[in-house]
């Protein structure tokens, strides 16, 4: 579900970062909830501190809830109404002026659940003047909006996938595609939502990816125009995220070769783990230990690297050949 065209929530009286009427009006616009990978961080320490604070706030929020079903999640925001309605391409919105959270009724239940937690994240953020002030001091404009959306995704992950649950998945399955699939199942969220939460907590160099059958990439479709229309579906990357120390991800839409472990896992319905490679879109390959786990029509994949190899021959070659696959 990876950058959202959104606007930040704008309470009045924010220390060091007050907003005018125009910004306040922007805050109530509906917006999609898409996990955001930030391309450039001008103040990494500020963002890291803000994420840590947001996790603490979300953990405190969850601790006071009677449960984690939809009704229980709303218990921490008394006075705020929850409404489900068709929202087109938008996933949801939080309108602080009218105290209402809107959720797209046409979205899948897993998507609705993450969206609700994300919108609750907006409410949590609005309730902490110090954190709001800090991020307004450090960022502005579109970058501020991106940071706010990122913090709300951090909150959503902390609400639905708390650190002890992620730690349990990593302990049981290691940093693998199966850990990703099991986390999504346990938290009742999509694998794309679980992707970013797992990435944040994985201590070793890994690229995680969610792959699913879909239409052939545009490049391939264009080359096959003379052959006429095709109904064949190709396994492609839907979302990807990398842990600290790994500078690349797989771009959305990257095709997965038919002989790759991920394609084999989809074809057989069985987990496949073997020494293989990262299939960059250009055709270049980077060695990695691959674990591909099929689940509910998708394949959750991990590409684990030998730390000693990072920054050496393979990654230097990727650096020259794969700028389009750099982490977004």
UniProtKB/Swiss-Prot annotation:
Record keyword Hydrolase present: yes
Domain of life: Bacteria
Annotated catalytic residues: 119
Residues given in the record as Zn(2+) binding sites: 118, 122, 149
GO molecular function, one term: DNA binding
Deleted gene: phenotype: Mutant is sensitive to ionizing radiation, UV light and mitomycin C.
InterPro entries tied to this protein: G3DSA:1.10.10.1030 (IPR044853), IrrE_HExxH (IPR010359), Rad_response_metalloprotease (IPR052345)
GO biological process, alphabetically ordered: proteolysis
EC number(s) stated in the UniProt entry for this protein: 3.4.24.-
Domain notes for this protein: Composed of three structural domains: an N-terminal zinc-peptidase domain, a central helix-turn-helix motif, and a C-terminal GAF-type domain.
Function: Plays a central regulatory role in DNA repair and protection pathways in response to radiation stress. Acts as a site-specific metalloprotease that cleaves and inactivates the repressor protein DdrO, resulting in induced expression of genes required for DNA repair and cell survival after exposure to radiation. Regulates the expression of dozens of proteins from different pathways, including the important DNA repair proteins RecA and PprA. Binds to the promoters of recA and pprA.
Full protein name: Radiation response metalloprotease IrrE
């Amino acid at each position: 579900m990876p950058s959202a065209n959104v606007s930040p929530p704008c309470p009045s009286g924010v220390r060091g970062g007050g907003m005018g009427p125009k910004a306040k009006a922007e805050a109530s616009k509906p917006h999609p909830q898409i996990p955001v990978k930030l391309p450039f961080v001008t103040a990494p320490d500020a963002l890291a501190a803000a994420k840590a604070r947001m996790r603490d706030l979300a953990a405190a929020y969850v601790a006071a809830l009677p449960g984690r079903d939809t009704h229980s999640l709303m218990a921490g925001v008394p006075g705020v109404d929850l409404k489900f309605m068709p929202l087109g391409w938008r996933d949801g919105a939080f309108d602080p002026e009218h105290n209402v959270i809107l959720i797209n009724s046409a979205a899948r239940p897993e998507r609705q659940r993450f969206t609700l937690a994300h919108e609750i994240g907006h409410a949590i953020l609005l309730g902490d003047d110090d954190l709001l002030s800090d991020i307004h001091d450090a960022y502005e404009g579109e970058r501020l909006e991106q940071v706010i959306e990122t913090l709300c995704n951090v909150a959503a992950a902390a609400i639905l996938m708390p650190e002890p649950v992620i730690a349990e998945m990593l302990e049981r399955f290691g940093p693998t595609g199966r850990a990703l699939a099991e986390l999504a199942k346990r938290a009742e969220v999509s694998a794309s939502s679980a992707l970013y939460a797992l990435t944040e907590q994985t201590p070793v160099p890994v690229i995680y990816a969610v792959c699913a059958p879909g239409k052939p990439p545009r490049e391939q479709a264009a080359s096959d125009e003379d052959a006429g229309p095709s109904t064949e579906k190709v396994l492609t990357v839907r979302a990807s995220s990398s842990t600290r120390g790994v500078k690349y991800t797989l771009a959305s839409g990257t095709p997965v070769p038919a002989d790759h472990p991920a394609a084999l896992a989809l074809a057989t319905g069985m987990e496949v783990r073997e020494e293989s490679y990262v299939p960059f879109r250009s055709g270049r390959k980077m060695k990695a230990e691959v674990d591909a786990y099929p689940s509910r029509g998708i394949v959750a994949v991990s590409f684990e690297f030998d730390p000693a190899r990072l920054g050496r021959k393979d990654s230097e070659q990727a650096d020259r050949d794969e700028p389009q696959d750099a982490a977004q």
